[in-house]
Amino acid sequence: MAASAFAGAVRAASGILRPLNILASSTYRNCVKNASLISALSTGRFSHIQTPVVSSTPRLTTSERNLTCGHTSVILNRMAPVLPSVLKLPVRSLTYFSARKGKRKTVKAVIDRFLRLHCGLWVRRKAGYKKKLWKKTPARKKRLREFVFCNKTQSKLLDKMTTSFWKRRNWYVDDPYQKYHDRTNLKV
């Protein structure tokens, strides 16, 4: 009764516990077989058969310790590849201290995907502006091509992921963002 309830609970669990379902059911089946084998070997049915003291043929020795249900090494070996992906936390690939000079490094993906204005705002494209365009309407494609500002939290995070080199003012020839670098009519 308890074993079926356990198997039902494991079967009901989703996601991470799916590999455990196969493991638990096979372990349970092995335990039942091993328990019946142990009981068959431990009974006195075969007491009248005598084995020679020294045998010329190697025989299979079966001990209760080998037949028990504790397959801890098998469980650990099966679950070892799954555990790092479960326990892995989301991280920013930010180098706080470089190996050679001990300085912070810029995350290159930030430089490729975002543009920092001198006033501290970050500009980005909308997500999915290149994806599955065949099923998007022209109006939606136009909206996705627009540039938008990042919010305060995103801007602070992006500032932490870049060095001071990327925060300096640049004077590019024919810069289309020249009029947006400085905020005007801003009441502080």
From Swiss-Prot:
It holds the Pfam family Ribosomal_L35p. The keyword Ribosomal protein applies. Gene3D superfamilies: 4.10.410.60. One of its GO terms (biological process) is mitochondrial translation. One of its GO terms (cellular component) is mitochondrial large ribosomal subunit. Coiled coil: none annotated. InterPro entries: Ribosomal_bL35-like, Ribosomal_bL35_sf, Ribosomal_bL35m. One of its GO terms (molecular function) is structural constituent of ribosome. Component of the mitochondrial large ribosomal subunit (mt-LSU). Mature mammalian 55S mitochondrial ribosomes consist of a small (28S) and a large (39S) subunit. The 28S small subunit contains a 12S ribosomal RNA (12S mt-rRNA) and 30 different proteins. The 39S large subunit contains a 16S rRNA (16S mt-rRNA), a copy of mitochondrial valine transfer RNA (mt-tRNA(Val)), which plays an integral structural role, and 52 different proteins. This is Large ribosomal subunit protein bL35m. It comes from Homo sapiens (Human). The lineage of its organism: Eukaryota, Metazoa, Chordata, Craniata, Vertebrata.
